[in-house]
Curated annotation (Swiss-Prot):
This is Uncharacterized membrane protein HP_1331. InterPro entries: Brnchd-chn_aa_trnsp_AzlC, Brnchd-chn_aa_trnsp_permease. One of its GO terms (cellular component) is plasma membrane. It is found in: Cell membrane. Belongs to the AzlC family. GO terms for biological process: L-valine transmembrane transport. It comes from Helicobacter pylori (strain ATCC 700392 / 26695) (Campylobacter pylori).
Length: 228
């Protein structure tokens, strides 16, 4: 327990930016869900067991349109397909996490993946507990935000337009932090070029997954050149 608390204290400061974003986005999700006639228990269930922001927002649209369960499942898989790329790149770090592994796989969101690649535990801090703490903290923020949003939204109505930009802003900050911490920026520029080209060719609806696959392939094929 002492080792876990040590790792938890080390991990918490790194998650503060996610805390702010997840609370706002979680509250937005909760408010939108109750506006469709669902109560806080549905918001809590989805945030506990689905825990995928984009999928949860898409699910609201599909549920309001009375889409079939099969359609919901297919769209969810397509929207979250990019997580496969994240999981593959984390295999080495997750392989010795023992009982934590199922939860770490479940809690690997875009933002958690970014933090795990940006920060490392201090000397003397267990990496397994550090990774677990970051994942648990981020998940807790999302659950709390969703719950508060659904409870508040049950009694008051809010204009949530523009709130989705919060997560985009967080990603920009995380990218800039990682960029400043490293001297080799080849990977960063490769990712930017691939993303821009894919956006121009495939549009906003399809570019993300294609760009991620191409990035992974490029990193595998040109690993030595990029590390020089």
């Amino acid at each position: 327990m002492h080792e876990f608390l040590k790792a938890f204290k080390d991990a918490f400061p790194h998650t503060i930016s996610i805390l702010l974003g997840y609370l706002l986005m979680g509250m937005t999700f909760g408010m939108l869900l109750v506006q469709q006639g669902y109560d806080y228990k549905v918001a809590l269930f989805m945030s506990l067991f689905i825990y995928a922001g984009a999928v949860q927002f898409v699910a609201i649209t599909l549920l309001s349109a009375q889409a079939s369960l099969m359609n919901v499942v297919i769209v969810s898989l397509l929207v979250n397909a990019r997580q496969t790329c994240y999981a593959l790149s984390m295999l080495d770090r997750f392989k010795n996490t023992k009982w934590r592994l199922p939860y770490l796989a479940h809690a690997l969101t875009d933002e958690t993946f970014a933090l795990l690649n940006l920060y490392a535990p201090k000397e003397g801090v267990s990496e397994k507990d550090f990774i677990f703490s970051i994942s648990l903290l981020n998940h807790s923020y999302w659950i709390f935000g969703s719950l508060v949003g659904s409870l508040v939204g049950s009694h008051f109505s809010f204009d949530t337009q523009g709130m989705e930009f919060v997560m985009t802003a967080i990603f920009i900050v995380l990218f800039m932090e990682q960029y400043k911490r490293t001297t080799n920026h080849k990977n960063a520029w490769l990712g930017i070029v691939i993303a821009v080209v894919c956006l121009a060719l495939f549009g906003t609806e399809y570019f993300l997954l294609i760009a991620l696959v191409l990035m992974v392939l490029a990193l595998m094929l040109f690993r030595k050149q990029l590390e020089c």
